[in-house]
Amino acid sequence: MRRSLAPSQLAKRKPEGRSCDDEDWQPGLVTPRKRKSSSETQIQECFLSPFRKPLSQLTNQPPCLDSSQHEAFIRSILSKPFKVPIPNYQGPLGSRALGLKRAGVRRALHDPLEKDALVLYEPPPLSAHDQLKLDKEKLPVHVVVDPILSKVLRPHQREGVKFLWECVTSRRIPGSHGCIMADEMGLGKTLQCITLMWTLLRQSPECKPEIDKAVVVSPSSLVKNWYNEVGKWLGGRIQPLAIDGGSKDEIDQKLEGFMNQRGARVSSPILIISYETFRLHVGVLQKGSVGLVICDEGHRLKNSENQTYQALDSLNTSRRVLISGTPIQNDLLEYFSLVHFVNSGILGTAHEFKKHFELPILKGRDAAASEADRQLGEERLRELTSIVNRCLIRRTSDILSKYLPVKIEQVVCCRLTPLQTELYKRFLRQAKPAEELLEGKMSVSSLSSITSLKKLCNHPALIYDKCVEEEDGFVGALDLFPPGYSSKALEPQLSGKMLVLDYILAVTRSRSSDKVVLVSNYTQTLDLFEKLCRARRYLYVRLDGTMSIKKRAKVVERFNSPSSPDFVFMLSSKAGGCGLNLIGANRLVMFDPDWNPANDEQAMARVWRDGQKKTCYIYRLLSAGTIEEKIFQRQSHKKALSSCVVDEEQDVERHFSLGELKELFILDEASLSDTHDRLHCRRCVNSRQIRPPPDGSDCTSDLAGWNHCTDKWGLRDEVLQAAWDAASTAITFVFHQRSHEEQRGLR
């Protein structure tokens, strides 16, 4: 072969008449041979077959590319951003990067030996012989809570997280994956559940995530709160999907995108949705499986026949956590529904539960029960608690005494005014509601009578229109009102409770910088509060069912600000009793009682919670000798039942028989406190306390363990003392107790 055609020489030549390297190679186009220069000897030689076009540029000329075409081509690339090939994908690209498969020995996600590490699972110890026999790719690893969370968890919260994890991973009850978080308000149930979700989404003993998706179902007013709490504690490590509005198609599209996520591609692994929205769109959520469902305010599921319960029960998941600070609200059968939802079958069927547990326990709790009934009731109670305690964790608010200032609760009995008394007696004579209350069953008319009497106890202005229209029970009652009376202007002196409230607000405003929360079950009563505040020139804000969720958050944030001039926060217990944090105030007035103690407890827990720095004062106003005291007594009966089953307190006294609770429509004008009369208190003589409460008593104790006062001298609240001075005839009796003894120098 001629040397000039050798590959080593061919690559160095400059072909003639060529404009670019895209033309075909022709062996005849060669140039005369030149002697190598020293620089040419350093050029890398390459081999090029004569039967294909060269792979490298054969000339020193630049490639023939049109610059405008090049720029246009680059722009076309940049104008088409990468799109994730997942149907209906809405989230970000995520923070997970591609990488190599983990090599070496399997290890826990976080160091179990680190200081204050919270270890949820520890592999069983293995001998050296066992370690050689087992496959290293199948060795279980420690499950350790992320240090970003474990360092902020309090001791009771660490215990709670471990309990929850053991329940949902079927380590406490084999074959069952549910539990009830029944801690009282203020103990951090939300943080514990966020820690559980984050741990399950990131790790397991098998060195992979336990779940890939979780759903949080809550009241609509708490959807935004859950979203904020996830962001607060996880700091952007995860992007939850909160459904708080939108059209049906938009919500369906978001839910389909959530359900279509798989494995490591889950960019939004937490869905936060309201009960109402969940029920309406459950068809989309049933199309796939979910690793975990958390139901906040889970006592909504007390009735297994309602649509919300059935919709949630149809969700394809075995891991279920139910959050409820008050799992028993009305009866044990509702309690059964909650336990059955999280762990189906552990208490049998509803019929079996009622026969074996509910009837014997309730019969044994009745004040008129025989000794045999009591023994059987206690035996069945022990059996029930032994079963349920394996999947229910309950801590009371006395734990908070280590972290929060003192709380003083006061039940203030107020005397009816002469106008209220005459209206009350006339209604009982005319409407005769007691005759319609047969066998403890309430008819529609008796329920209406209860509402009328409750409103009358708040203020006669609330039943003035009924008097004008001469409705049943108020015929001729208009003559009892003062001459020239108008419901447009509020007259506090016509209501015993409103008069006491007027004094409490005035004394608080003049003697301190404290703020006050006013709570009522009726928006009409909130209207009266507004009139009172305008008359006294108090700045106020109001939250009821008409306010949007977004506006609620802004109103609460503004009120809690130390620079806010607002003095009063008016709250409808029906609309906003759950989840609100009103630590800007340290005094709360519960103006009227609810049949359900859980509603009142929720509302009263708004000020005594994390972040509160001042001593808290809770006032529960009751009209003495009226239906309000009967409602309060019914609450005590329910709370005693709850204490027996959930708190396991065996010394809760049996004060009220079911027969006594039927005496709703009796007015006792002479009684200072019908509730105290029924206690048969041994520490009081002629309604005056002569011995203090037992040692260790606090706000969670039975009323028999509270202080009982018929004058101001035993009170610990200077504001109530001054109000009692001003309204000497309006206040008849006060129960009061504190949450704990203040530990000076330790805070």
Swiss-Prot record:
Residues that hold ATP according to the record: 183-190
Organism superkingdom: Eukaryota
Compartment annotation: Nucleus
Record PTM N6-acetyllysine, positions in chain: 515
Effect noted on mutating residue 63 to H: In a colon adenocarcinoma sample
PTM description: Acetylated. Acetylation promotes interaction with BRD9, and subsequently with RAD54, which is essential for homologous recombination (HR).
Keyword entries, A-Z: Acetylation, ATP-binding, DNA damage, DNA repair, DNA-binding, Helicase, Hydrolase, Metal-binding, Nucleotide-binding, Nucleus, Phosphoprotein, Zinc
Ranges for domain Helicase C-terminal: 500-653
Cross-referenced SUPFAM superfamilies: P-loop containing nucleoside triphosphate hydrolases (SSF52540)
Record keyword ATP-binding present: yes
Annotated segments matching region Required for chromatin remodeling, strand pairing activities and coupling of ATPase activity: 2-9
E.C. number: 3.6.4.12
Sequence segments annotated as region (Disordered): 1-41
Protein purpose: Plays an essential role in homologous recombination (HR) which is a major pathway for repairing DNA double-strand breaks (DSBs), single-stranded DNA (ssDNA) gaps, and stalled or collapsed replication forks. Acts as a molecular motor during the homology search and guides RAD51 ssDNA along a donor dsDNA thereby changing the homology search from the diffusion-based mechanism to a motor-guided mechanism. Also plays an essential role in RAD51-mediated synaptic complex formation which consists of three strands encased in a protein filament formed once homology is recognized.
Similarity comment: family membership: Belongs to the SNF2/RAD54 helicase family.
Protein name: DNA repair and recombination protein RAD54-like
